[in-house]
Amino acid sequence: MLEQLPYLALKTPPKTTALLKAECADFIVKEHLGYEMSGDGEFVALYVRKTDCNTLFVGEKLAKFAGVSERNMGYAGLKDRRAVTEQWFCLQMPGMETPDFSQFELDGVEILTVTRHNRKIRTGSLEGNYFDILLRGAEESDELKVRLDFVANFGFPNYFTEQRFGREGHNLTQALRWAQGEIKVKDRKKRSFYLSAARSEIFNLVVAARIAKGATNQVLPNDIVQLAGSHSWFKADEKEDLTVLQVRLENQDILLTAPLIGEDILAASDIENEIVNQHSAFDSLMKQERMKAVRRPLLMKAKGFSWAFEPEGLRLKFYLPAGSYATALVRELVNYTEE
């Protein structure tokens, strides 16, 4: 699936091999919500460090310890299990004392902060994540250094990676069967997973087509472009001067986007329209399920991107906004194998 997608850096697969997540400590993620806890309110907020632990499993254990329903537990995003991750959880406990979480015990879990907050921490309510990744066995080479410089300066394809599609692409396979009327899907969680996989596939294919045509840094007629630093976007139609927009793109004032298909999707560039039309079953499914079309940047540039070669391999440190995948960046640098 992902292995079929083209590369942006050097237009070829990386020559360097590396192990990813050989140890949990090789993949460190720290969540950034973008706001501070209020210090009071009906929600107990917990900042937790997890090692080799599933987000939902830990959340359920915290809720059970506090004596509240799992429905009253919240978090901003699911984190990788095979990793060391830090993230916030909240428990709705109006009029109740904060439990003594110093008595909470769970292998691989350390509660770093306990406070209060005045609203629920909801899925998606985060700005991004800080990453500290060790690529074991990655040796210094001219080719790898060129790739590192490229990613630092120009970014990487903002692909959705394997975890979006389920084990061996199961979610995408089921989405196609659903779209073709072969199955019915009643479970709400499965419906969400399958719809996300289908939209992600179309997005990836549009990005891949732009790379194949050498159009990742070129504003095409009818492109949908996004203002940098916001989610506002507009169409590069006949009312817009493409020459002016091209300068704005090169100055990183605007970003090219690709679609997460759904209702009210706009006709865009010919490249994009061709891909969407080739997958009309998915397009129809999104409209049937009343999914609203949204835009996502075609490329992503990591903030604070730095690297260092160590005896064990290559260490990367960077920040990505919510929704972008660290593994999409890593695949531009090395041919990695996950342990």
Curated annotation (Swiss-Prot):
GO biological process: tRNA pseudouridine synthesis
MF (Gene Ontology): RNA binding; tRNA pseudouridine(13) synthase activity
Gene Ontology CC annotations of this record: cytosol
Active site: D80 (nucleophile)
Keywords, sorted A to Z: Isomerase, tRNA processing
Documented EC number(s): 5.4.99.27
A Pfam family annotated for this UniProt entry: TruD
Catalytic activity, reaction form: uridine(13) in tRNA = pseudouridine(13) in tRNA
Enzyme class: isomerase
Chain ranges of the TRUD domain: 155-311
InterPro entries: PsdUridine_synth_cat_dom_sf, PsdUridine_synth_TruD, PsdUridine_synth_TruD_CS, PsdUridine_synth_TruD_insert, TruD_catalytic, TruD_insert_sf, TruD_pseudoU_synthase
Source organism superkingdom: Bacteria
Segment forming the signal sequence: none
Known function: Responsible for synthesis of pseudouridine from uracil-13 in transfer RNAs.
Membership in a protein family: Belongs to the pseudouridine synthase TruD family.
Cross-referenced HAMAP family: TruD
Name of this protein: tRNA pseudouridine synthase D
